[in-house]
């Protein structure tokens, strides 16, 4: 694997773990203000992000690449209202998308088709992530100012359940340098 592609994939692992950390912080905030549905939404989101990190980890391992773990930064944000985490989440998802796009571009430059194929799943996933974050902002803008609307939105978010991702492209690996 190209050294730059491997480096970018390693960096993405850290970004995904940071995402999980950030979303757990959002979940903690919402739990502290009694919005259990919002807490559930972001707790599930944190699980997804952790799994995304593990998918990148497994892809690197399957391809004989080393994995380097960096420190996870403390999330910094103002806990001033219920909308702040929602807007911060959308901005963050856009940053994650940009990171995945950068890996794809680097893989394209060196004709690393296997990595490009693996990233196709993440590109689609990021489209979903950004849409979900934007939709949540829209719903909060529509209903969040009304206590009944906020209650209904909170109840809707409480119903979200975690589903682990599955990526069959991780089953296909190149020979490990250890096998050479």
Located regions from the model:
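Acidic/His metal-coordination segments adjacent to aromatic residues that form catalytic metal sites
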Residues: 1-6, 71-91
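Acidic interhelical loop/turn segments
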Residues: 2, 31, 98-124, 138-151
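A structural feature that tracks compact, well-ordered secondary-structure segments
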Residues: 8-12, 20-24, 97-101
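Generic structural signal for well-ordered, non-transmembrane alpha-helical segments
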Residues: 14-17, 43, 47-54, 87, ...
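Conserved alpha-helical segments that form or flank metal/cofactor-binding pockets of metalloenzymes
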Residues: 30-71, 133-136
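Short, flexible active-site-proximal loops enriched in glycine and acidic residues
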Residues: 62-72, 99-101, 110-112
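Short terminal interaction segments
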Residues: 143-171
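Single conserved hydrophobic/aromatic residue that forms the stacking wall/gate
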Residues: 172-180
């Amino acid at each position: 694997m190209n050294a730059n592609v491997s480096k970018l994939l390693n960096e993405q692992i850290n970004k995904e773990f940071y995402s999980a950390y950030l979303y757990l912080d959002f979940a903690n905030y919402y739990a502290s203000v009694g919005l259990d549905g919002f807490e559930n939404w972001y707790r599930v989101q944190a699980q997804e992000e952790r799994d995304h990190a593990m998918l990148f980890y497994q892809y690197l391992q399957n391809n004989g690449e080393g994995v380097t773990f960096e420190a996870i930064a403390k999330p910094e944000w103002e806990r001033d209202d219920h909308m702040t985490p929602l807007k911060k989440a959308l901005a963050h998802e856009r940053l994650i998308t940009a990171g995945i796009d950068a890996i794809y571009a680097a893989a394209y430059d060196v004709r690393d088709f296997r990595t490009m194929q693996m990233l196709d799943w993440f590109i689609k996933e990021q489209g979903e992530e950004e849409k979900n974050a934007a939709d949540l902002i829209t719903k909060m803008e529509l209903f969040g100012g009304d206590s009944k609307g906020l209650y209904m939105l909170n109840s809707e978010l409480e119903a979200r359940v975690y589903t682990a991702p599955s990526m069959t492209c991780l089953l296909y690996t190149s020979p490990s340098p250890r096998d050479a």
